Amino acid sequence: MILGLTTILLVCFIPLVFGAVTADSPAAVERERPAPVAKETNADRFRRGLGPLPPTRREHNNLSPRASSVPCTRLSNNVGMLQINRVSDGQKIGYLSARFNRRKAYTVHPRPAAALKVAVPPVTAFGVAINLVAENPPDSTHMFLGAVDDGQGNVGSGEAGVAILSGTSSVHANSPPSSSASTSLTLANHGGVESQIWTMNCQTRQVTAQWINTDNSHPQTTIFYDPAHEYLGLSGDLEAHSAAVSRRAFGVFITFVPE
């Protein structure tokens, strides 16, 4: 009788031991997992008298880079010279000359005393097109430092066409070449004129150009100097231009140097 009772107790006890839920068992984990918290909405916050949720930050890979978070400061002197340096090695080759070449295009002079003096806006916002206005122009009827289509087609990749720097009349920013604007350039069969094509980094004072084609396309624009023909110009493909016209042309960068 005692043996039979012991057997019954063991039979009842074993399932309790081996069937018990341990702390590591899936059932225990599921039971201990906290219930999901409902995402708070602006409506929930408004009902509790709170302000709206902060805006969600999203990462974008196609954001345009900014030049700097440092604000532009007013120039103490907004009249100065334009220094010309070779892109390949940074060597200074001179300054934008106050005299034209034989076709009345702007060229380079090694001495600052012979440099063209230009006025820039006292404050230049990043990326905003500006005019460069000559203070001692070789042609007083064309005081703007502009560019003139050479008549050989668009400026752009694979194109030999360029724009030549010369004195011009004023043309609005973001405009294709104007056939009604005038220029000092005496090159035969040249195309239209642009003047407000420049931007200046207010911290480095580097001056860059953006040419606009007749179809309103905006090609990547390289400033270059051609020592064989003694002129400065704008190209969208300097290799294509050099192969077709002048193998001596090379890229340059321009820096505004206040007086």
Question: What is the meaning of each model-derived region?
Answer:
Residues 2, 11-28:
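N-terminal signal peptide
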Residues 2-3, 51:
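Long amphipathic N-terminal alpha/beta scaffold segment
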Residues 13, 18, 46, 100, ...:
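Phenylalanine-focused residue identity feature
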Residues 24-96, 158, 163-259:
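Extracellular glycan/ECM-engagement signal in secreted proteins
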Residues 75-170:
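N-terminal "domain-start" segment
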